Curated annotation (Swiss-Prot):
Transcriptional repressor that modulates both activator-dependent and basal transcription. Involved in the generation and migration of neural crest cells. Plays a role in mediating RAF1-induced transcriptional repression of the TJ protein, occludin (OCLN) and subsequent oncogenic transformation of epithelial cells. Represses BRCA2 expression by binding to its E2-box-containing silencer and recruiting CTBP1 and HDAC1 in breast cells. In epidermal keratinocytes, binds to the E-box in ITGA3 promoter and represses its transcription. It is found in: Nucleus; Cytoplasm. The keyword Transcription applies. A zinc finger (C2H2-type) spans 128-150, 159-181, 185-207, 213-235, 241-264. GO terms for molecular function: DNA-binding transcription factor activity, RNA polymerase II-specific; RNA polymerase II cis-regulatory region sequence-specific DNA binding; zinc ion binding. This is Zinc finger protein SNAI2. Belongs to the snail C2H2-type zinc-finger protein family. Repression activity depends on the C-terminal DNA-binding zinc fingers and on the N-terminal repression domain. It comes from Bos taurus (Bovine).
């Protein structure tokens, strides 16, 4: 064990360390807020007395919180006030300039968009244009109706039947025509097939004997409305089908043909 640990030493309590003391009228300001601004923690060297230990700011005034800052200090940054605030760089207009400083050309789409935004009426004047014939319409529904019915370029498109050589303008007309080949409506009594449901319904009445359509001028009745409509023409005063041989008139073309086939009186 070293000898220094075995030697008893007496400690003099009356002896104090020689700390440098400040003047009585000086005030030490710790880092805090000075009127809402942060006080710099790095003071100027000439303000401190010799022998101070910590880098704190010292001002010789009785009211430190309302006194002006020492000369040469800025309340915001702690740097000398001669430097002033660092102003932000002016905004650079990079909208139409490239990195070389020359103006970059604006595309046609951007120019059209800028002109449309500058003129609010241009947006209202925007119309729906047909891509086939370049006609414009104020509503989308009007454009759709034009494409379906009235567009000449669209009418040149045709839908062909896979069972025959017929062609149709619309797909709906083609589907109605295909039913004449497939005949989906079949009679359960005799097995006869029809393309339309109303044709099947009229056929079933020939089996049941039902005749719901009666003539108001005579006692005849019919199973189908179209037959009643043709019969009503016989009661009409207008008979537009005339025989060329005897000048006799008929209300229906079928009656005229029957008259000519049976033998016209004038022909003999």
């Amino acid at each position: 064990m070293p000898r220094s640990f075995l030697v008893k030493k007496h400690f003099n309590a009356s002896k104090k360390p020689n700390y440098s003391e400040l003047d009585t009228h000086t005030v030490i300001i710790s880092p805090c807020l000075y009127e809402g601004y942060p006080v710099p923690v790095i003071p100027q060297p000439e303000v401190l007395r010799s022998g101070a230990y910590s880098p704190i700011a010292v001002w010789t005034t009785a009211s430190p919180f309302h006194a002006p800052l020492p000369a040469g200090l800025s309340p915001l940054s702690g740097y000398p006030a001669s430097l002033g605030r660092v102003s932000p760089p002016p905004p650079s207009d990079t909208s139409s300039k490239d990195h070389s400083g020359s103006e970059s050309p604006i595309s046609d789409e951007e120019e059209r968009l800028q002109s449309k935004l500058s003129d609010p009426h241009a947006i209202e004047a925007e119309k729906f244009q047909c891509n086939l014939c370049n006609k414009t319409y104020s509503t989308f529904s009007g454009l759709g109706k034009h494409k379906q019915l009235h567009c000449d370029a669209q009418s040149r498109k045709s839908f062909s039947c896979k069972y025959c050589d017929k062609e149709y303008v619309s797909l709906g007309a083609l589907k109605m025509h295909i039913r004449t080949h497939t005949l989906p409506c079949v009679c359960k009594i005799c097995g006869k097939a029809f393309s339309r449901p109303w044709l099947l319904q009229g056929h079933i009445r020939t089996h049941t004997g039902e005749k719901p359509f009666s003539c108001s001028h005579c006692s005849r009745a019919f199973a189908d409305r179209s037959n009643l409509r043709a019969h009503l023409q016989t009661h009409s005063d207008v008979k537009k089908y005339q025989c060329k041989s005897c000048s006799k008139t008929f209300s229906r073309m079928s009656l005229l043909h029957k008259h000519e086939e049976s033998g016209c009186c004038a022909a003999h």
